[in-house]
Design a protein with these regions (language model features):
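Surface-exposed, low-hydrophobicity beta-strand/loop segments enriched in small/polar/acidic residues
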Residues: 1-150
Length: 150
């Protein structure tokens, strides 16, 4: 095991205006919530480069086929009624779903993203959307916030 000094470890400043999901279990597909309401963050008209900090406190992998696709989505609609684009995605779950050599466990994940689509369009409104697949009993519990890169 090697030691990484505090100078070289990234730190992420929490800003409640950039909170995308608070603690709460997700057992079916849908948008993330803060205070029991769907959370949409307006990052303005310009480019936004950041890291989505995802702290997983619990993840169900009991039946061996669970999958959780955590997406950063952008839209030009403040309600996400139209123009929805997946900007970044993280897949967690059983190794059968993720294609990894081991099942995922609780812990911090950092997902780099920006608010530009593949066509170069800048999306002002952002949210987290979770797609849940296969046999789910309890689901996944995590919090998520964005940290803007300077």
């Amino acid at each position: 095991m090697s030691y990484t000094s505090a100078k070289s470890r990234p730190s992420y400043q929490f800003d409640s205006l950039l909170e995308f999901k608070d603690a709460g279990l997700i057992a079916s597909s849908g948008p993330a919530e803060v205070d029991s309401a769907e959370k949409i963050v307006d990052v303005g008209r310009g480019a936004f480069d950041g890291d989505m900090v995802i702290d997983v406190s619990a993840i169900e992998i009991g039946t061996g086929d669970e999958g959780y696709h955590i997406q950063v989505q952008g839209s030009d609609s403040a309600t996400f009624a139209s123009g929805v684009e997946r900007l970044a995605s993280l897949t967690l779950g059983d190794s059968i779903v993720t294609g990894g050599s081991a099942d995922n466990a609780a812990g911090r994940r950092v997902l780099p993203f920006n608010n530009r689509g593949l066509d170069g369009k800048v999306y002002r409104y952002l949210r987290i959307y979770v797609e849940v697949e296969r046999t789910i009993a309890t689901g996944i519990n995590f919090t998520a916030f964005a940290s803007q890169r300077s």
